[in-house]
Amino acid sequence: MRLSRYFLPILKENPKEAEIVSHRLMLRSGMIRQQSAGIYSWLPIGLKVLNKVCTIIREEQNRAGANEILMPTIQSADLWRESGRYDAYGKEMLRIQDRQEREMLFGPTNEEMVTDIFRSYVRSYKDLPLNLYHIQWKFRDEVRPRFGVMRSREFLMKDAYSFDLDYEGAKMAYYRMFVSYLRTFARVGLQAIPMRADTGPIGGDLSHEFIILAETGESQVYCDRAYLDLAVPGADTDFRNDAQLTDIVTRWTTPYAATDEMHDEADWAKVKPESQVSARGIEVGHIFHFGTKYSEPMGAKVQGPDGKEHLVFMGSYGIGPSRLVAAAIEASHDDAGIIWPKAIAPFGAGIVNMKPGDEGCDGVSEKLYEALTNAGVDPLLDDKDERPGAKFATMDLIGLPTQVIVGPRGVAAGEVEVKDRKTGERQSLDIEAAINMLTAQA
């Protein structure tokens, strides 16, 4: 993409309404625009990052055996009355009526609807286990939306729902998603720690939040430093191997870790003082096992191997991709702007043409652009006629992992300068060497 043709509305000043780093940088770098309280439009560069996050989530959900579907945003109130949550959910739920005066709602979550889909088609235990997921926009009417997309009213959510014949099967479904989440966050470039959590309005008897440590986190969290050194499950993880999954979950739940609501001072005192980490944290995922909480009132049953009907055991598993984008910024930035992990960076590299209109600079910039594009690097070419300082500031602000600087002096010497955004290190390379280095990273 050429910057001269790209919609990138950079803000020079810090927005007054932005309270935290991610909100400020997302507005300044032209990722989002606020349309009303807690509701945002995603602009081109923000949407690219969001889509990359969703791609990683999809790949890991599919790897774990989940099936993608797409449920509507508008749901019937009748389904929620079946589960008993229509009146219990509170004012966060946006209730509406259609022209026939039928009561509807803008879905804040999808347990009822997915249970209705399940009971309409699945009759036998032979069709289990089953895990259905979708990525869809949701709405919760927060009393005080703040922190940009970190706590917005409309947000993108990946929610998965598992169905099993019995508790043991449901536990393994929970373990599969637990391990899948560890891999997902690591691939996005975040170190997430699973912590026992309250089940809240979702209900159930087992729940973990996945927390990343960040100074601007909403919650106080406590964990053993051992988590910081645990190896994330690799690409060779076999999601059909119950023993392997159980071993991974055991390793990731044995050291102490708890949110403020679940914190136990007596257990905390057993952690060596030098291993105690007390910090702020951001929730990036939440998983629940809730047994027959929804299948019982909604009649979701299957015929078991004994010929009798059995209520299915269920779980739900959520990741907020839009929130995850903000969390990645909170975890990786500096005074100049965002520092994107490579996996979710909007572009693989930025090419900075220091002197557009100069034959040499234009020629080298085009050569780099073509070579990197053909290699799948997806570069952003800054071909705008602006002063060098403005070009550097833009590249640092939007946080591309690598910058390739093309200037008249370097071109005369057959070289370009390559800058690593994270470390700030610069090196001069001949043009072919720069192309080889960047294409090797694609």
Curated annotation (Swiss-Prot):
Protein name per UniProt: Proline--tRNA ligase
Annotated signal sequence range: none
Source organism: Brucella ovis (strain ATCC 25840 / 63/290 / NCTC 10512)
Family: Belongs to the class-II aminoacyl-tRNA synthetase family. ProS type 2 subfamily.
Compartments in which it is found: Cytoplasm
Taxonomic superkingdom: Bacteria
Keyword match Ligase: yes
UniProt EC number: 6.1.1.15
Role this protein plays: Catalyzes the attachment of proline to tRNA(Pro) in a two-step reaction: proline is first activated by ATP to form Pro-AMP and then transferred to the acceptor end of tRNA(Pro).
Catalyzed reactions: tRNA(Pro) + L-proline + ATP = L-prolyl-tRNA(Pro) + AMP + diphosphate
